[in-house]
């Protein structure tokens, strides 16, 4: 009579292996839930990239055969479409309220891939969009009797000149550092070209000279550009000072590479926008409520 009771007791007792298995499954589910929530939070915190440059292919330059590029020839174009057409209602992109995404079409005039047509997808505020057309509009404005008015105000005057004098050593140091950095990259790229892509005679003649004269060349270039940037930033108005002070290197390395015929050695590329006068007409037709826009200039 006692044997069935013992059997029943053994059946009712939980197995230690089953308990450990349940704990493992519960822990796995908890970790999976935490990772899923963490992944969702991480997605919501991601910010949309400020800009992306898409290089146009040869088929995209000509409008005569728009249907040729199909299948695998459109990865970069699809990347740009996904970049612009991504749903902004989700919380994945943190788009500022006063910003919008526009497409600026231009040509690389200096640097790598010179002459290449590019589409620049960039986020710009309303103020930045207006500043794109400001140089054209300001050049059309003429002062009465052809005289330039020298006015005094909060944004222009002797106090601005005093400020530029104070910033003179700071601008010199910053320009020296930036010019040294870009100059070193340019020198290294030129050295690689003559060492790996040119003939044996270039390797034994140019490369030793580049190595020997590097300290003299880099110090002379950085010091000259630093002194030039410090003098040029002296101004009467805040706007002119900021335009001159923020351009530390003055595009010298890109200009030097273009003169030497070594555009690929430039540490950066300069893109010239096409038909910038169309920006103002494009902006006038936009709905201010719309957050994401595309304008071709």
Swiss-Prot record:
Residues 181-210 are cytoplasmic. Residues 1-85 are annotated as: Disordered. One of its GO terms (cellular component) is membrane. InterPro entries: TMEM169. The chain crosses the membrane at residues 160-180, 211-231. Residues 1-159, 232-297 are extracellular. This is Transmembrane protein 169. It comes from Homo sapiens. The gene is TMEM169.
């Amino acid at each position: 009579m006692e044997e069935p009771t013992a059997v029943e007791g053994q059946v009712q007792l939980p197995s230690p292996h089953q308990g450990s298995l349940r704990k493992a499954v519960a822990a796995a589910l908890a970790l999976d839930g935490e990772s899923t929530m963490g992944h969702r939070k991480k997605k919501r915190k991601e910010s949309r990239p400020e800009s992306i440059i898409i290089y146009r292919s040869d088929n995209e330059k000509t409008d005569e055969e728009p249907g040729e590029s199909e299948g695998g020839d459109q990865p970069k174009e699809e990347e740009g479409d996904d970049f612009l057409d991504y749903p902004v209602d989700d919380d994945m992109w943190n788009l500022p309220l006063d910003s919008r995404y526009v497409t600026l079409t231009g040509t690389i005039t200096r640097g790598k891939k010179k002459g290449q047509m590019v589409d620049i997808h960039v986020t710009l505020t309303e103020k930045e969009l207006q500043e794109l057309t400001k140089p054209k509009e300001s050049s059309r404005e003429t002062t009465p009797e052809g005289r330039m008015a020298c006015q005094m105000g909060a944004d222009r005057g002797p106090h601005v000149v005093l400020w530029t004098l104070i910033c003179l050593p700071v601008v010199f140091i910053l320009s020296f550092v930036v010019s040294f950095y870009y100059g070193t990259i340019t020198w290294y790229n030129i050295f690689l070209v003559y060492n790996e892509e040119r003939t044996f005679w270039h390797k034994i003649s140019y490369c030793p000279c580049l190595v020997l004269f590097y300290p003299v060349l880099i110090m002379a270039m950085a010091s000259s550009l630093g002194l030039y940037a410090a003098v040029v930033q002296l101004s009467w108005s805040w706007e002119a000072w900021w335009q001159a002070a923020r351009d530390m290197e003055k595009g010298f390395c890109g200009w030097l590479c273009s003169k030497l015929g070594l555009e690929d050695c430039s540490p950066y590329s300069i893109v010239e926008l096409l038909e910038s006068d169309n920006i103002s007409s494009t902006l006038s037709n936009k709905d201010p409520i719309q957050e994401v826009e595309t304008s071709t200039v």
